[in-house]
Amino acid sequence: MNSTPPTSPVTRVSDGSFPSISNNSKGFAYRQPQKHKSNFAYSHLVSPVEEPTAKFSEAFQTDYSSKAPVATSEAHLKNDLDVLFTTPRFYSPENLALMFRLSNTVSSLEFLDEFLMGILLAPEMDFLSNPSYSLPSNKLVGQGSYSYVYPISSSASSRCNNDSGVVLKFAKSQHKSKVILQEALTLAYLQYMSPSTNESHIIPFYGLTYITKSHFRRLRSNECVPGLILPKCEMSLYHFNTAVSHKLSLITKRKIWWRLMKQMIDALKSLKTNGIIHGDIKTANILITEMHVLNGGHCKDFDFYLADFTSAFHINQTPTDLNTTVEYCAPELIDSSSDHVPTFESDLYAVGLCLLSFISQHEPYNELQALVSHGSSPGIGSSSIQQSQWLINALLKKDPINLNMLRNDLFQDWKSELALLSRILVDRLPLENLITILDSNYI
């Protein structure tokens, strides 16, 4: 487990679908992978998102049609997948074949490598074969335990400062490449099953490329690491809560809260339809599109997207370890009598805590922990072990609303919202029942 603050790529989301370019792009076309017909047990499920494929940035309207494809990144990816599958953490070849519904095709495992290459790689944005792409060394967007996030600069871009409108989330070192590849497999799968991620509010995935020390000098001379091409967003919900929310009127904040609720429920619905558990939902992993705060405490509409799938896994394969954030854990994930494996229910619980943080403008239990610590209560000490034990004890009380709403005025101002959160965090209402309530009473 971890208790780290924001690690997601804070970048602008474009209405995108993997891996597709607008028909208006000049001489630039991605191949949209075709779904394989199958009698797989879940083939009747229908994605909540059915939209035309989306647009890429105008920066990538470069004509490569006359050039033969360069397989540089492809060779590295094939080798890395072979290594990944020898000791799979989340995805085995057999599991992936089932997920992508290849199990009833002839020699599905033999076809799997070729299939994965087709849905993962972004050949028109291959850093190893196209020198027009670079990573500005002075523009770090974010970083986590496994990765850095930098904007992609393109000399072919018509934008100012060669801004391409996308970012690269890449492994910090070669031995951390597995985590990035697992996230790429999850995002590619979600986008393959639901060709547009706009209405499902899951971060779009534009493909994978490899970089070396020539692109990022902190890498070792012999390292070649994978990176995810993702769209830009304005900020994370964590940043919104700490730096923007206080500037807005209560009416505006309540409107945004309901928008956040609906869009995260849409994301959870899409994940459950496709059998994916996120495993680390928190305010730092919910990204916000371009937002403009207006005079009078108002702001223009914007959207939320669920991001950072480094802990995600498919229900057909149980993860070998738990890598999540303690503050956002459902009680059963830390209870000694449970299996400690994230579920659809624990994902919904984490979304509930994100919505609670939106109201309190504090991370879960952070305000109470600071208050107790400063009051020299015997229940909490200064050591990290004592603080962690205090946090675990607070989680096991199963009273998140009262332990996080420390101002009386919040109960009055957010009465209906807190009543709904009580159904999520205390009654532990299933997602389907929550959707029914929202459809009939709130939306």
UniProtKB/Swiss-Prot annotation:
Q: Which residues form the Protein kinase domain?
A: 135-415
Active site (catalytic residues):
D280
Keyword set includes Nucleotide-binding: yes
User: Which SMART domains does UniProt cross-reference here?
Assistant: S_TKc
- Provide an example Pfam family for this protein: Pkinase
Gene Ontology molecular function: ATP binding; protein kinase activity; protein serine kinase activity; protein serine/threonine kinase activity
Q: Which InterPro entries match?
A: Kinase-like_dom_sf, Prot_kinase_dom, Protein_kinase_ATP_BS, Ser/Thr_kinase_AS, Ser_Thr_kinase
Catalytic activities: L-seryl-[protein] + ATP = O-phospho-L-seryl-[protein] + ADP + H(+); L-threonyl-[protein] + ATP = O-phospho-L-threonyl-[protein] + ADP + H(+)
Q: Binding positions for ATP?
A: V141, G142, Q143, G144, S145, Y146, S147, Y148, V149, K169
Q: List GO BP terms, alphabetically.
A: negative regulation of UDP-N-acetylglucosamine biosynthetic process
Ordered alphabetically, the record's keywords are:
ATP-binding, Kinase, Nucleotide-binding, Serine/threonine-protein kinase, Transferase
Q: What EC designation does it have? A: 2.7.11.1
Q: What residue ranges are annotated as transmembrane?
A: none
Q: Tell me which domain of life the UniProt entry assigns to the organism this sequence originates from.
A: Eukaryota
Top-level EC class as recorded in UniProt: transferase
Q: Which PANTHER family match?
A: MITOGEN-ACTIVATED KINASE KINASE KINASE
Protein task: Probable serine/threonine protein kinase which may function redundantly with MPK1-independent branch of the PCK1 pathway that is presumed to be required for the tolerance to high temperatures and staurosporine.
Similarity field: Belongs to the protein kinase superfamily. Ser/Thr protein kinase family.
Also noted in the record is: Present with 1590 molecules/cell in log phase SD medium.
> What is the name of the protein in this document?
Serine/threonine-protein kinase ISR1
State which gene encodes it: ISR1
